[in-house]
Amino acid sequence: MARRFRVAIYAPHFAEYSYRLAAALAKHCDVRLVLNRKDANQQWNLDWIPAPSPFDTRIRDLSLRRSGAIGLPRSFLDILTFRPDVVHCHECPEYFTAGLMELLRLTSLPRILTVHDAIPHSEGGSGTNTSEERLRERMRSAATHVTVHGQSCIADFSSASPDYRGEVTSSMHGVLMVPPAHNTPVKATDGRILFFGRMWAYKGLDVFLDAIDLLSKRGVHHQAIVAGRGPEMARFGKRMENMPSINAIDAYISPADTSALFQSAEVVALPYKDASQSGVLASAFGNCRPVVASATGGIPDVVTDGVNGLLVPPSDATALANALERVLTSRSLAASLTDGAHQTAAGSLNWDHIAERLFATYRRVAS
């Protein structure tokens, strides 16, 4: 009997993304997924994700503290003893993945690296200091193949890493935070706008608050939820306290509450000043909710204006307010965009479709 193709996925971060990918890939090949104990189940309950075909998951303590002295070597052995045909890693500026990629460089194994942010964000986020830049360079130089999320991200990667000689291909960012099938759907609350995520400056919270001020002055019925942690919550905390239509949630949000938040929104706002792709966008579509988003980075590769959301120029509060008003005041438009979000989730952002294309790439690079 022929040996089945084997893929090892090393994911100290992006646990939900990696688990959904592994579950879809397992229909085509044997998969071993290595996760970080700190990251697994933090944002989403992995037990809620359907996995019709079994695969092997190893959860290790990956830290630079004493406990990581055992977990880190074990995680490397998890990869090597699986005897994979391909190893797939995520780029994140930390020492675990950089060390594994350089170790694997001593072998003939193909090394696939998913680059989530080809260019660091302008204000805040990871990859914005010299140490993280060096780690990113180490990982990219050790990769035999790079995947990014969308065609615009290929251009960004080529600009950021002009000396990279391997192949770069697009593999879309699949849906996240999809509610379990047994859950009762949450009905959208009339006029509710959700702004969700890690609150760094590039996310455009200041632009969003300016747009909410405009909606209030125009008398547009709305309520906005700003949910997440980060420095911008502290910077704009007092301002939000004085805005009656805003409910700010600066606290940990459980997976169940996160799903309910997305479903309760009529529209999700992503007024990013710059972006590659967005897990928040993937989560909005995973919950069949349309978006009003900035036309920047890889977002227009996923959001088709007037189909599954509305696109606006970045840092333009008036354009953002106008687009939000259109969705909130037109039931037919809101319904059409919601259907478009559902179709996108079932189409280009469906993990089965993504895994099928990735598996073809794995076979090709391993041949």
Mark where each language-model region is.
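Conserved acidic donor-binding segment of nucleotide-sugar-dependent glycosyltransferases
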Residues: 305-306, 310-317, 326-332
